[in-house]
Amino acid sequence: MLRVFGSLTRSRSSSVLSQDDKIKQILKQAHDFEIALQAMDYVLDDRAEEGLALLKKNEAEDGSDQTINVLARGVIEFLEATLGFEAEEMKKASETLAKAENLSLKSRQYAQKNDLKSSSLYAPGTVYAVTYTESCLLHALLMIFSESYVETAKALLKLRKAYYMLQEIFEEMKKVKQTNGNMSIYKSETNHSEASVDSSNASFSSVDIPYELTREESNNSLYQESAEKVQKMRVRRLTGSHIGNTPAIDRLRSELGLDGPKVTTEENSNEYSALSENMDFSQATIDEFIHSGVNLCYGILQVVLSLLPSGIGAVLSVVGFHGSREDGLRLVWRATKQRNIHGCIGLLGLMFYYDGPFQFTDADFDIPVPENELKKTKSSSTYEEGDLDGPTLLHPGKILEDALLQSRALFPHSALWLLNEATMLSGQGRLRDSVKLMDSIEADKIEMRQVKSLLIFNRALTLVHLHEYERAADDFLSLLDISSWSHSLYHYFAGSCYLEIYRMHQLGVRKSDRPEHFKQRATDLIFGAPNLLTRKSFNARPLPLDRFMLRKVDQFKATQKRLKLSDPLDAIATSPVHELQYFYNGYNRMGKQDLELANIMLTEYHNPAIDAKEPNQEMIKDFLVSLTYRRLDRAEEGCELLDRNVLPKIFTMVNGKVKYFKKTEDPWLYPSALYERSLFSWKLKHMDGLEESKEWLTRAQGYADDYELSTRVEMKIKAAIDRVDESL
């Protein structure tokens, strides 16, 4: 095959391309895109080295498409960076994606200049417009994930470039659909059992060549051999057999969990058995890449824009740069229907949106979509037959489960998809099932170090929600040898776990045979954590949670000095592990017994710092206790506690207007308390409380400030406001 594609290429320095040159380059381009898609799938199966080796081998070939090779490497590095959030990995991914941006613009210009049309539906160079926007988007997301106002502002300039180009391509896609009489452009009418290469009578046609061949061209054996190769690569990729795994259909389960039943199939499976009846085997590789790439990138971009703080969003809207959360989610869902990297990244993005730490869809904010909103959904500019309606977009339930289970079947070696299944189980309150699933894989055998560290970190969090603190601390400390993300936070989190073990022993809730050991470990780790703080973050500044940790330890030291305490642990009032749990959605994931234990530890434990009743520490304690009440079906008590002990210290009403008391001790608390108060209004009054909920959310949004967790808190507030607005 190297001989075939070597003879099918020619130097791009040529000023004029013949028809023969064009066919050769078109087929080589389709081949290189299939190679790139295969390489990225290796990564999704926890075999990154195999994927990178495949790209390296292809890059060395004469006439190889460097643009898609570099983008594929950038996507692999992006996944590694966003899974681990390590400074060096994020820097490396950013540099590669920047290179992919430049190459994409050059390749697009080359295709346009030479009228090199590689798609039967779109203008020359369109596929490189997609690679450009994908590079820009992923690069900008790395900047946004820094959770910094400044970096977010810089990212917006990059997103703006991608936005207008994506908008242009998306409008072209709609025109193509209308021209084809509203027939789907994503699935052709060709029966998938028929190869798109017909070699009968020594002639052929190929969906990857976007125009009709002459008799001489259709008899060209080199064209035919390369076209057949591309078609076989595509079929193997679509069925999941391209990376050497046994038939995915044999591993497909119908339910989540380690013991979930398998899907029964009537026919004997083979390596070409598809997981979905909607699989299109006859769509050209370049067209598939364009469709899935635009749906993914334009969809993610719209969701991100819809979640930006209102101040930034309002400015962007003036210049026509705005996003729709519903339209964006619908496009991302559409991308997941494609069996390629775009579909998988789309699914990972949806998992982050529905079950991630930012709580974009809070379990307590289960507002139904009104009838008029369903009609609006169908009239949306992005809506197509077969898309998800409003309620399903908000709570996809089984549809999201099934999509994840398909990825679990396709990529059996990957701890990444196993981790996402565990996260989904946690989101359903099945914490022990989640830990059991994560324990089923041997961490040391996970090839991708970032996935290994992420799985251990998430297992530690789940164990914290279960109050299994000793094992959680062990997991946090084990990360010191695996991940460079935040050694200071790992120490602080582990120390907070040991402190809670010591407190439970003191209170008699759970006796320990080594209380003094845990006490000393808590002291060493909590107060020693700032010493590990380095400036290794992507943007040369401490990470948000590092700054949070540093502020907390400074508070503890100040309290110890003020109260003249000999034991530094006596200077810690509200349990730091319960405070940390709020940032990781812990109170929405705990079961009844776990919530009751959290309530006991927050309300019944005493030490000198707690008895001193420092106002801000009392606010944190009462805030967290109110959440346990709400989740324990004692919402009235929780709301009363919040109204009486927390909110009056945050704001007051003067002549009908809100006057905030700007506080700096724990800046995450104040807007979060206003946000949670809106959920109490919904929980207690349901639809009758929506106006009141909106009022509380507006107040939460008004308490804007640039603090260590501002991006996380404000995105959550913005998502809730949009959700309420849809139902008012």
Curated annotation (Swiss-Prot):
Subunit structure: Interacts with lipid droplet proteins.
PANTHER family in alphabetical order: TETRATRICOPEPTIDE REPEAT PROTEIN 39 FAMILY MEMBER, TETRATRICOPEPTIDE REPEAT PROTEIN 39C
Family: Belongs to the IML2 family.
Keywords: Cytoplasm, Nucleus, Phosphoprotein
A GO cellular component annotation in the UniProt record: nucleus
Cell compartments where the protein resides: Cytoplasm; Nucleus
Name of the protein in its database record: Inclusion body clearance protein IML2
Record InterPro entries: Iml2/TPR_39, TPR-like_helical_dom_sf
Coiled coil: none
Function (record text): Inclusion body (IB) resident protein that interacts strongly with lipid droplet (LD) proteins. Involved in LD-mediated IB clearing after protein folding stress, probably by enabling access to the IBs of an LD-stored soluble sterol derivative that acts as a chaperone in inclusion clearing.
